[in-house]
Amino acid sequence: MKKGLITSILVLTFGGLQAQPLPSTPKLVVTLTIDQLRTDYLEAFSALYGEKGFKRLMREGKVYMQAEMPFDKPDRASATATLFSGCSPSTHGIIATKWMDVSTLTPRNCVEDPNFMGNYTNQNSSPAQLLTSTIADELKVATRNAGKVYAIAPFRDAAVLSAGHAGDGAFWINKTNGKWCGSTYYPEFPEWLNQYNDSSSVDFRIKDITWMPLHQVSSYKYLSDWRTEPFKYIFESERENKFYRLAASPLI
């Protein structure tokens, strides 16, 4: 997999102080998968990071400088499946976000599954096309199903492939109405998420959301082409695709 289509950072969070012995089994495992974050960007923009975020991970964590997977032209789905399974697409089966279904001669999403209904969406989804286990599945095995596994992502393929076969829930943004949605394949769609959708989801707030640089444009020294043209995007100004564009932005 060429130079960082997706950067994935595994964070193991332990209770207690650093001076205390670490437990043999972590209580919390958090995986952050950032689409399109090239590895060299981590260094290029390091001066803009806070001390407790990426800087701490790179300073105190394990950093692999030559991590590659032997396949070409990755996209979001194939890369996510590879990161979570440790296998190439020829083994885990997710060759792309979409492919041609030879039986119907129509495009098929990699997590499309008519056997399950959607929550807050008309999309039918499951990880049935994923042919291997994932780190999420192995966590359920290691804890004898006592561990809880949830995946949250802007797009359904990323959420479903991250949650794996045994996850408790996978949630993503409905690009039509801005609600968090899911699939009946997974056993849980929490009541608090229902309440959030009914009162506080992004469709109630999108008119007030504006995408702008966090810092002064002049501080982004590696983006010289943009330094004379301030970037500002108002999502409400686009009637049809505003939730899709919000999901593809860093603000989600």
Regions found by a protein language model. Name each.
Residues 22, 62, 127:
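Cytochrome P450 catalytic-domain "roof"
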Residues 43-91, 148-152:
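Short, structured active-site-proximal loop/turn typified by the sulfatase FGly-forming signature C/S-X-P-X-R
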Residues 39-43, 76, 159-162:
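Extracytoplasmic/secreted cell-surface and envelope-processing proteins
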Residues 38-44, 67-70, 121-127:
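Second-shell loop/turn segments in exported
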Residues 26-38, 57, 83, 139, ...:
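Beta-strand elements within well-structured catalytic alpha/beta cores of enzymes
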Residues 88, 96-252:
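His/Asp/Glu-rich, glycine-adjacent segments
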Residues 1-25:
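Bacterial Sec-dependent N-terminal signal peptides
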Residues 32, 37, 49-52, 78, ...:
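Generic recognition of stable, solvent-exposed alpha-helical segments in well-folded globular domains
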